[in-house]
Amino acid sequence: MLPAVSAWLHHPLTRNSAFMHLWAGQTAAQVGFQVGTLATSAIAITILHASETQIGVLSALQTVAFLLVGLPAGAWVDGWHKRHVMIAADMARIGALISIPLAYGLATLTLTHLMIVSALLGLCTVFFDVAYQSYVPIIASKRYIGAANGRLEASYQVGHAGGPGLGGWLLGFVAPPLVYLLTALTYALSTWAIWRIRAPEPTPARTGAPLLAQIHEGLSFVRGQHLLFPLFSCIAAAAFAGAGVQVLLPILVLRTLDMSATQ
């Protein structure tokens, strides 16, 4: 056996069943989010014939929750059981996703319906992401938090890179609304994996402080860190620029260049 593989298999995190279940659930959710994002653009462009402005609004709805709810979500999740939040977010996403192929089969699918589902998916993703990031210190010892976050980030990058490719390949075989069934399956796998975690979770601390005070405390902490604040600023700028590309690329490929989703 290769030394690197042996070291990975015998790493304490690999033998930590709670972390491995969280990792599996987060990986499935990341892939599902990326596949669903591509399917949403394909439906809007090829089936509902949405305009560029409407596609822009649709794409914004998928990410606006991170801007509007990201900070309050962090404060709220601090006072909730993280595992319960992740399971609830996954189940809500499953219900929203299944409604798309259902409406498509009944010939009642509209752009408004798609926008509502996109906004709901974005909202649930915010709470899921905040909860799993806050859950890592609970199930992994302080010594291995860096390694745990490294594995989770690797899954995010793999999902970000491979999810659209998988979604494009699937769109070559089935109608875009039916791809949502696979996306719902990934969230079902995520729900199952996280439900299997049996690690005890401490009772959430409820400070009783007003929501705005909790948000201000978090922002003050980030601003006071010489490494965190520049990193936060770079990530925010990259996410803003990347969102613009994600809006324009499907329009360019599917409408302007008249290419298939598989291509």
What are these regions (language model features)?
Residues 1-263:
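Alpha-helical transmembrane-bundle signature of multi-pass membrane transport and export proteins
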